[in-house]
Structure formats: structure tokens, C-alpha cells
Swiss-Prot record:
GO terms for biological process: translation. The keyword Plastid applies. This is Small ribosomal subunit protein uS8c. Belongs to the universal ribosomal protein uS8 family. GO terms for molecular function: rRNA binding; structural constituent of ribosome. The gene is rps8. GO terms for cellular component: chloroplast; ribonucleoprotein complex; ribosome. PANTHER family: 40S RIBOSOMAL PROTEIN S15A. The keyword Ribosomal protein applies. Its main location: plastid. NCBIfam families: PRK00136.1. The lineage of its organism: Eukaryota, Viridiplantae, Streptophyta, Embryophyta, Tracheophyta. Keywords: Chloroplast, Plastid, Ribonucleoprotein, Ribosomal protein, RNA-binding, rRNA-binding. It comes from Spinacia oleracea.
Amino acid sequence: MGKDTIADIITCIRNADMNRKGTVRIVSTNITENIVKILLREGFIENARKHQERNKYFLVLTLRHRRNKKGPYLNTFHLKRVSRPGLRIYSNYQRIPRILGGMGIAILSTSRGIMTDREARLEGIGGEILCYIW
């Protein structure tokens, strides 16, 4: 049985966000680096840096937290894995779903690389829907 690295990074980020951790360390692969670049560009995380430990590379992510000084802790974002190894979900560019009316993003794996739903619609290409973020 193979390992689902996308589900692993989504779970690590979600757990760290729920436990109010400032940083997360995830395994660095080409797919995870591309997803982290999208998260940085869209403003869901503050910082990402590459770290080497015993010939293994890790990405150390700094999460963006919004704290209301008078009220409770505000959860930053939600992540949901859509396509998984047992059930792949594909979509053409016309049927890519809009997340919260355009407030969230969908990350797609296309023939031109990993990109957001907006970029895929602009380029007119579809692909495998990896996850939703809102």
C-alpha cells in the first residue's frame, strides 16, 4: 500500500492549526513544495523554509494565526482532501467547483503542473482535484 503524501501534509497542517502551533515540519517532495508555494502565494501560511536533517529534507512552515484579543481563537483555514489514491476525481476547466463563491481555492494537478482553480480556468485546462482550502 502506497503512502499518500498530500493527505499527510494536509493532516499535519490541520492538526497544528487546531492545536495552535506556530510551525509545522513536513517531508519535502516535489508535490509538497508546489502545494506549499501555492499556500504561500494565496496567503494561507506566512513562511516556508527548507531544512535538512540526516540527508532528509523537510519543509518548516510558519502558520498564519489570527487572534482576537478579546474573543476566542479564530481558526485560520480548513483543508479537505478530494482526490485520493483509491478514488481519483478529475474535472475539466468548465466544471471546476468554486469554493465559497471564490473565497476559497481548489488545488489541481494538471498537465502543466500543480495550480489553483483560478489559474486552471484562465489557461483553459482541467485536471485532478487534489484538495480544497477555505
